[in-house]
């Protein structure tokens, strides 16, 4: 059966106390709405319709995509009114209603819900809670059939004692929706058009009301304030940690690991505490990541090591390569197999060949460095003249003396050597020693200056 999905994302979120629309607040590096959209796509609907209101343009700009239809709710008059704004775009046999501030809902849960929907059958996602305060209550008759949903503010004391709550997520037969929405009334405490009122209409029309529940109640937890947002974050990270450990990853402390994007992992990977992965990260078998590292949009090949306090973005470490501690690899940094980058070394758009080494205190930008080349401490590639960037090229087996400055554009042939403290401004032929510094002079009888008396 065909499917349209409507995502309600028009709320202001006043309790967030933020200029940012509520649905754009992040969980694990993605907006809450972004998570919901990603889950919706897994269901392969014919259309995804996002109802926006507060901060509409910011939401539209952030989530803009060819497969999303944005619908404006100019006035926030309730959930029923919000869905009604999308009606002209709905044509599928089933319509699924989701919420932009409920980011942890799982696609498998929604598939089970949708499996229960038919022309004469509507499906609700409900949840059993110890404290259902704030949730609409699922009212059933003596036979256990759902007959209505009563919002918390409108519920009687007896109804508030019900522990089965309405998550707001429901799937309905598309052919019935327009009629039900057209009959909604705002005669309630809030003065709003409640989507939940369609349940009583469906019962009156003789439809069966099916229910489904999530595996985990946190799937349907929304975020109305910063505390709830933090709770969603920690639950998401806990879920990710369990999945990674099941795939053969050792997390020294699962509570001190954050994924803010997506990761592919091999087996026997070790990740120490306070590691953050962002964007798309690929980690192959046997990789070790030390504590306090941030790795973004990078690939770590088999057996690579990232030592403590290193920051990688847009980088690649070859098999058996290592970097750190305190290394910074910026976009375009590539370490060949068994290459080594040590402490306080920064690479940007630089390639180190197999077995090349830059042990400490260096900046290597816009550089191509051949296999087995050794970069001495304090080496700088001077790649910027104030207007343009230039490349430095070193062949295989080059030896760069400590505290050398290589003024690009410059090329050093295979086996070339620079003396410590040299400023290299011209190409160095293969096998040559280049010295670019003043000759040392020793001055006998030198008297150090003394402080003048005041």
UniProtKB/Swiss-Prot annotation:
Annotated GO biological process: cell morphogenesis; cell wall organization; lipid A biosynthetic process; peptidoglycan biosynthetic process; regulation of cell shape; UDP-N-acetylglucosamine biosynthetic process
Pathway(s) this gene product operates in, as recorded in its UniProt entry: Nucleotide-sugar biosynthesis; UDP-N-acetyl-alpha-D-glucosamine biosynthesis; N-acetyl-alpha-D-glucosamine 1-phosphate from alpha-D-glucosamine 6-phosphate (route II): step 2/2; Nucleotide-sugar biosynthesis; UDP-N-acetyl-alpha-D-glucosamine biosynthesis; UDP-N-acetyl-alpha-D-glucosamine from N-acetyl-alpha-D-glucosamine 1-phosphate: step 1/1; Bacterial outer membrane biogenesis; LPS lipid A biosynthesis
Main location: cytoplasm
SUPFAM superfamilies linked to this entry: Nucleotide-diphospho-sugar transferases, Trimeric LpxA-like enzymes
Disulphide connectivity of cysteines: none
Highest taxon above the source species: Bacteria
Bound cofactor: record note: Binds 1 Mg(2+) ion per subunit.
Residues where UDP-N-acetyl-alpha-D-glucosamine binds: 8-11, 22, 73, 78-79, 99-101, 136, 151, 166, 224, 330, 348, 363, 374
EC numbers for this chain: 2.7.7.23, 2.3.1.157
Region Linker, annotated ranges: 227-247
GO molecular function, one term: UDP-N-acetylglucosamine diphosphorylase activity
Region (Pyrophosphorylase): 1-226
Active site: 360
CC terms in the record's Gene Ontology section: cytoplasm; membrane
Keywords: Acyltransferase, Cell shape, Cell wall biogenesis/degradation, Cytoplasm, Magnesium, Metal-binding, Multifunctional enzyme, Nucleotidyltransferase, Peptidoglycan synthesis, Repeat, Transferase
Binding positions for acetyl-CoA per the UniProt entry: 377, 383-384, 402, 420, 437
Cofactor(s) needed by this chain: Mg(2+)
Region (N-acetyltransferase): 248-454
Binding site for Mg(2+): 101, 224
Localization, UniProt: Cytoplasm
Subunit structure: Homotrimer.
Family classification: In the N-terminal section; belongs to the N-acetylglucosamine-1-phosphate uridyltransferase family.
HAMAP family (alphabetical): GlmU
Function: Catalyzes the last two sequential reactions in the de novo biosynthetic pathway for UDP-N-acetylglucosamine (UDP-GlcNAc). The C-terminal domain catalyzes the transfer of acetyl group from acetyl coenzyme A to glucosamine-1-phosphate (GlcN-1-P) to produce N-acetylglucosamine-1-phosphate (GlcNAc-1-P), which is converted into UDP-GlcNAc by the transfer of uridine 5-monophosphate (from uridine 5-triphosphate), a reaction catalyzed by the N-terminal domain.
Protein name: Bifunctional protein GlmU
Gene designation per UniProt: glmU
């Amino acid at each position: 059966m065909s499917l349209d999905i409507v995502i309600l994302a028009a709320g202001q979120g006043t309790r967030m106390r933020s200029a940012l629309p509520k649905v754009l607040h992040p969980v694990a590096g993605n907006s809450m709405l972004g998570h919901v959209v990603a889950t919706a796509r897994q269901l392969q609907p014919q259309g995804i319709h996002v109802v926006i209101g507060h901060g509409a343009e910011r939401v539209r700009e952030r989530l803009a995509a060819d497969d999303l239809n944005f619908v404006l709710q100019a006035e926030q008059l309730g959930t029923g009114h919000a869905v009604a704004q999308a009606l002209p775009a709905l044509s599928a046999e089933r319509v699924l209603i989701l919420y932009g501030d409920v980011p942890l809902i799982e696609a498998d849960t929604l598939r089970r819900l949708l499996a229960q929907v038919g022309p004469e059958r509507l499906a609700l996602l409900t949840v059993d809670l110890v404290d259902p305060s704030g949730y609409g209550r699922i009212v059933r008759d003596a036979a256990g059939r759902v007959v209505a949903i009563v919002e918390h503010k409108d519920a009687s004391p007896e109804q508030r004692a019900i522990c089965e709550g309405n998550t707001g997520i429901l799937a309905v037969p598309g052919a019935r929706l327009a009629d039900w929405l057209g009959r909604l009334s705002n005669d309630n405490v809030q003065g709003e058009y409640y989507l939940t009122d369609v349940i009583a209409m469906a019962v009156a029309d003789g439809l069966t009301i099916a229910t489904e529940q999530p595996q985990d109640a946190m799937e349907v937890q929304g975020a109305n304030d910063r505390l709830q947002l933090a709770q969603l974050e920690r639950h998401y990270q806990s879920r990710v940690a369990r999945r990674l450990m099941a795939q053969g990853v050792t997390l020294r402390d699962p509570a001190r690991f954050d994924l803010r994007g997506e990761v592919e992992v091999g087996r026997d990977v070790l990740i120490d505490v306070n590691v953050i992965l962002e964007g798309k990260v690929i980690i192959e078998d046997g990789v070790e990541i030390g504590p306090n590292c941030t790795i973004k949009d990078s690939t770590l090949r088999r057996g690579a090591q990232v030592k403590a306090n290193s920051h990688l973005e847009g980088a690649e470490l070859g098999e058996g390569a290592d970097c750190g501690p305190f290394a910074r690899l910026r976009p375009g940094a590539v370490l060949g197999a068994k290459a080594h980058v040590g402490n306080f070394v920064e690479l940007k758009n630089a390639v180190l060949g197999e077995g090349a080494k830059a042990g400490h205190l260096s900046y290597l930008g816009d550089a191509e460095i051949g296999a087995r080349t050794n970069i001495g401490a304090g080496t700088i590639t001077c790649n910027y003249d104030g207007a343009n960037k230039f490349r430095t090229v070193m062949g295989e087996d080059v030896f760069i003396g400590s505290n050398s400055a290589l003024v690009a554009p410059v090329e050093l042939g295979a086996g070339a050597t620079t003396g410590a403290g040299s400023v290299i401004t011209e190409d160095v032929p293969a096998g040559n020693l280049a010295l670019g510094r003043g000759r040392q002079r020793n001055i006998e009888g030198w008297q150090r200056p003394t402080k003048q008396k005041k």
